[in-house]
Amino acid sequence: LITVRVDHHSPNSRWYSGAGIYRRVWLKKYPECHILSDGVYISSDIDGNVTITAETARPKDMPVAGLQLRQTIFDGDKLICTSTNNCNAAFDGSFPEPVRINEAALGSNTVTMKIPEPVLWDIENPHLYSLTTDLIKDGEVIHTVINKFGVRKAEFTCDKGFFLNGRHVKLHGCCEHHDLGALGAAVNRSAIKRKLVKLREMGINAIRTSHNMPAVEFMELCDEMGILVLSEGFDMWEKPKTDYDYARFFREWADKDVASWV
């Protein structure tokens, strides 16, 4: 039995925050060798070169021999490319302290794959590919993680503004809080989608989140619907703006929260 209690005090922000546990909570069970939670990082260019880094954990007394990572890119159900490599023993990143695994050896693998003639993600055609990462031990798949991603290039210039895939794009944006009006702060995917559909009908193509890290469901829907996102992390830093806001926890939690956010 696991019991979680929320100690709610107000005012804790300058806006309606809601109270309680209003987003999904995961209790994850992993094999002793596994891919870290949120441990797959994907970057790409418009030529279709996709760089993937996967972070893994295993018992310290377990040799890395016999462990492999297989990455496979799909376009819908169509297999585009695949790559299998032996796991590295070394880890070149940082591991957030709250989820540190006792007596774990950490490793990271980076591989670059090629999507021929990629369909680019765009606000008018938000095309998404799917990456399946399999951790293999002695020939058997023991852990699988699936991520969706788009192939695109985003850049800002000081004199001409924003470009997406080399095309000049005007940002028609809004500042959007996480609550759902009369429905409150609890995450509701269909209600979020309804709101985003209405914003798109108004001509919105970009959203700045306010003023905390957005829900996973919100980010997934923006990817699927062709909406650019300026994702804001904090509104309070070390100096508080209200009596019970995030400034109370900033020194202890900011670095860890950013790691899980990114």
Provide a role label for each language-model segment.
Residues 1-229, 252-260:
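Secreted/periplasmic carbohydrate-active enzymes, especially glycoside hydrolases
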Residues 172, 231-255:
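Active-site-adjacent "subsite" loops/lids of carbohydrate-active enzymes
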